[in-house]
Every structure is written in structure tokens, then in C-alpha cells.
Amino acid sequence: YFSYNDKIIKILEAEYLNADHHFTAGTVISDKLEIACGSGILRVKKLQQESKKALNIEEFLRGTNILKDTVLK
């Protein structure tokens, strides 16, 4: 899970990409909500914002704009 705009968002489905990068862990590195990890990249596929229904990434990003280079907590 991560926190964004004071809301907890659970990651329900994701894919791990074994790729080198230079970003700080937790940084959003693409418009499709790919998140830099300490090692590799997490490509989020399905998530759920607190008190909301689960959404695939396309549905979620239509209503929530998490900008590239945002550092998630």
C-alpha cells in the first residue's frame, strides 16, 4: 500500500520488472503508475483507495492524477 493526498491506497495486483533505474524508491516513473523500488520497478495493475471499490489502473487514473516524479510514501 501507499499514501497519496492523505488517503491510503492498497495495491491489489502488480507486476515486478527487474530493471535498473536511478530513481529514489517510491518515485512514480511513468504515467501508467510504475513505481521505482529499491531494486527494480513495480507496475501497478489494480488498486483500491480507502472506502472505494477496487479499480484497474486505467479506471483509477481516469479519476486520480498521480504525476510522474511524485514520491509515494
From Swiss-Prot:
Gene Ontology molecular functions: methionyl-tRNA formyltransferase activity
Superkingdom, taxonomy of origin: Bacteria
SUPFAM superfamilies, A to Z: FMT C-terminal domain-like
Transmembrane segments: none
Reaction equations catalysed: L-methionyl-tRNA(fMet) + (6R)-10-formyltetrahydrofolate = N-formyl-L-methionyl-tRNA(fMet) + (6S)-5,6,7,8-tetrahydrofolate + H(+)
Protein EC: 2.1.2.9
Keyword Magnesium: no
Keywords: Protein biosynthesis, Transferase
Enzyme class: transferase
Coiled coil region boundaries: none
Role according to the record: Attaches a formyl group to the free amino group of methionyl-tRNA(fMet). The formyl group appears to play a dual role in the initiator identity of N-formylmethionyl-tRNA by promoting its recognition by IF2 and preventing the misappropriation of this tRNA by the elongation apparatus.
Similarity comment text for this entry: Belongs to the Fmt family.
Name assigned to this protein: Methionyl-tRNA formyltransferase
This protein's encoding gene: fmt
